[in-house]
């Protein structure tokens, strides 16, 4: 009798566990996923598909620094994505920056469209460094930026300036290049 009672008590728990295992809606259908959440996930994943020269880091165990230029809302979104994550044995950290000079120790720098007027000067300052510059504005690649986010049909798409990446000493994985909507050789 006691066994039956225990089994009956387990059914609700088993049912709940099975519901949790069912797949949810695809990411593209999820209404609560913001554009910045998608871009933050991309930035984190760039750290997995881009190789930097050894001199781009202060030491062999230095973290991968994802820097955000003057954009607190995006910075907090990115912090949520990378919290506690490691890539290639390195911790991933988010660093707010205010100037191009502060970006010199970064591996990735995100320049929001709100900072578009500064982007040319920042890209010029970082041109001969191994900083992966990522933007979200028209003409970003033409100014020498390396990766640009564009919205098309409510989807975040990538454009890549492979030539600028090579000049910066960065190696972008063919897997990342294959998902780009546009690649400038």
Language-model segments: what does each one mean?
Residues 2-185:
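Short hydrophobic alpha-helices and adjacent helix-cap/hinge residues
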């Amino acid at each position: 009798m006691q066994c039956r009672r225990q089994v009956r008590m387990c059914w609700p728990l088993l049912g709940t566990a099975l519901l949790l295992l069912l797949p949810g809606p695809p990411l593209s259908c999820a209404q609560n996923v913001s554009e910045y959440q998608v871009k933050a996930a991309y930035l984190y994943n760039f750290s997995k598909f881009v190789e930097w020269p050894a001199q781009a880091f202060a030491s062999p165990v230095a973290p991968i620094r994802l820097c955000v230029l003057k954009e607190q809302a995006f910075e907090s979104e990115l912090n949520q994505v990378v919290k506690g994550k490691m890539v290639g044995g390195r911790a991933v950290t988010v660093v707010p920056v205010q100037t191009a000079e502060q970006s010199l120790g970064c591996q990735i720098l995100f320049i929001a469209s709100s900072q578009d007027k500064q982007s040319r000067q920042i890209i010029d300052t970082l041109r001969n460094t191994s900083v992966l510059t990522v933007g979200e504005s028209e003409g970003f690649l033409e100014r020498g930026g390396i990766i640009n986010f564009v919205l098309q049909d409510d989807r975040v798409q990538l454009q890549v300036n492979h030539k600028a990446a090579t000049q910066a000493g960065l190696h972008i994985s063919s897997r990342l290049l294959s998902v780009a909507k546009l690649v400038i050789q």
